[in-house]
């Protein structure tokens, strides 16, 4: 266990010399936005669902733009390869746990999502201890998109009724009302199914990495 942790710390130390380019700054900002999201959800100020919706939407946008900018400008770094998916996992798991605390999501769904993300994170840490970097796969990226869509849809579901007069003036209630009641639960199911399936596939494809230590 000590060698495992030591290998990971050594890996991070070696990569700490990488300059904080724009994609990496966006990745780090996702950690900050996630903390702010959790603070709002659990403090429950007035219109907290809408505030949480705005914070999570911005966090989701950083996930899109950090990868896009990194690929476009050739700014892909080992730091980004490791920390970008980690930021995604913390963001998503935090949201699902917060939803569980609010009574919005069944416990078994949260268990599947959190267990999957912890398992994949553990696999990446194991790879890091061996000086290997496991990049996210396409199926995993689709999974992350489905999770973000599901979380935003659930936040819309629980916030749009608060919009009252403003919602009627700007037509938001008309825009969201007809579909959010069925789309949010459906997107949640899709996200959980993709989360479980992508996790099984990722663990199977990289089985040699952890089976070698058994």
Where are these regions (language model features)?
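Juxtamembrane helix-capping/reentrant segments at transmembrane boundaries
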Residues: 20-23, 66-88, 131-143
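Active-site His/Glu-centered metal-binding helix of metallohydrolases
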Residues: 32, 61-69, 86, 90, ...
């Amino acid at each position: 266990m000590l060698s495992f942790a030591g290998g990971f710390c050594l890996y991070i130390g070696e990569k700490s010399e990488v300059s904080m380019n724009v994609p990496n700054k966006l990745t780090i900002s996702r950690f900050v936005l996630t903390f702010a999201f959790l603070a709002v959800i659990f403090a429950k100020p007035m219109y907290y669902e809408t505030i949480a919706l705005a914070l999570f939407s911005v966090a989701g946008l950083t996930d899109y733009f950090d990868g896009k900018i990194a690929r476009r400008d050739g700014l892909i770094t080992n730091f980004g390869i490791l920390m970008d998916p980690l930021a995604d996992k913390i963001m998503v798991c935090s949201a699902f746990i917060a939803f569980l605390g609010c009574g919005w999501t069944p416990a078994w769904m949260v268990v599947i999502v959190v267990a999957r993300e912890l398992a994949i994170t553990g696999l990446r840490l194991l790879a890091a201890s061996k000086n290997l970097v496991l990049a996210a796969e396409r199926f995993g990226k689709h999974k992350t998109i489905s999770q973000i869509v599901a979380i935003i849809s659930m936040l819309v579901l629980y916030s749009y009724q608060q919009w009252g007069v403003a919602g009627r003036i700007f037509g938001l209630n008309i825009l969201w009302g007809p579909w959010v009641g069925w789309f949010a639960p459906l997107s949640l199911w899709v996200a959980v199914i993709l989360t479980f399936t992508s996790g099984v596939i990722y663990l199977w494809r990289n089985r040699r990495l952890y089976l070698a230590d058994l």
